[in-house]
């Protein structure tokens, strides 16, 4: 039986922090036909508010170190300030949006990341996404807006990479829908030269990705984004793209193969 289609859009923290760009993205998001779901980051907002509170932000390989103080900050910022701002803006555009963290309805459960070379602190690696509950919401006309917070089922909130939330959610929904996953951020796509917007890599497969990682072309925060993109394709997500926040139709971005 043919499945219905759904578009999962993940919007990055740089766009979330810029009110005019976020407004334009939400305009375009609302124009997407059919079922849709939004996952947001908010790292820049968290860093900014942490600094105002005198809390240092530490990153390793594009991933945030989340100690107890930073966990309180990201919970406030991701689950509150950023999420509810997006929900309110979607409501103003006629979207029946519902803000969620992974703890709400037990939608995303995770475990605290094991300490290996780096202790990331209160960071969660996803165990399960309840695609059935999300599908029930979506079929009732709700547009879920998911913050990058999960829980371990023992009363603990964990900070989880938003790209991972998007990928794992897309994978879970692929049991019910034909899923298109779009990573929307401040650049036109994956660039061969980070200073040249004209150097976008139009198609990227795993072999090319590994080559670009080895020679340093792809590094930092792009690494987890692409690792999650390839995991989604492998798990049955139909289409994955990385593109500029103004290009949700993916006319100019990078397609993952």
Task: Place the predicted regions along the sequence by residue.
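C-terminal catalytic "cap/lid" subdomain
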Residues: 1-257
């Amino acid at each position: 039986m043919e499945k219905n289609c759904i578009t999962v859009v993940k919007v990055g923290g740089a766009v979330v922090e810029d009110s005019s760009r976020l407004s334009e993205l939400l305009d375009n998001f609302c124009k997407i036909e059919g079922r849709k779901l939004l996952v947001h980051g908010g790292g820049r907002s968290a860093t900014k508010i942490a600094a105002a509170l005198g809390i240092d932000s530490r990153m390793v390989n594009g991933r945030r170190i989340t100690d107890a103080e930073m966990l309180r900050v990201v919970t406030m910022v991701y689950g509150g300030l950023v999420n509810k701002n997006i929900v309110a803006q979607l409501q103003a555009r006629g979207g029946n949006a519902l803000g969620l963290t992974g703890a709400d309805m037990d939608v995303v459960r995770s475990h605290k990341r094991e300490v290996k070379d780096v202790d990331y602190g209160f960071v969660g690696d996803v165990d399960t996404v309840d695609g059935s509950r999300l599908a029930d919401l979506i079929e009732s006309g709700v547009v879920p807006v998911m913050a990058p917070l999960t829980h371990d089922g023992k009363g603990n909130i964990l900070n989880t990479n938003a790209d991972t939330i998007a990928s794992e959610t897309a994978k879970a929904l692929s049991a019910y829908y034909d899923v298109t996953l779009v990573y929307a951020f401040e650049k036109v796509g994956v660039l061969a030269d980070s200073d040249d917007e004209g150097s976008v890599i139009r198609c990227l497969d795993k072999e090319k990705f590994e080559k670009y990682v080895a020679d340093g072309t792809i590094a930092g925060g792009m690494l987890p984004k692409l690792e999650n993109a390839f995991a989604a394709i492998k798990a049955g997500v139909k289409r994955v793209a990385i593109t500029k926040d103004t290009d949700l139709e993916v006319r100019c971005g990078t397609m993952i193969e």
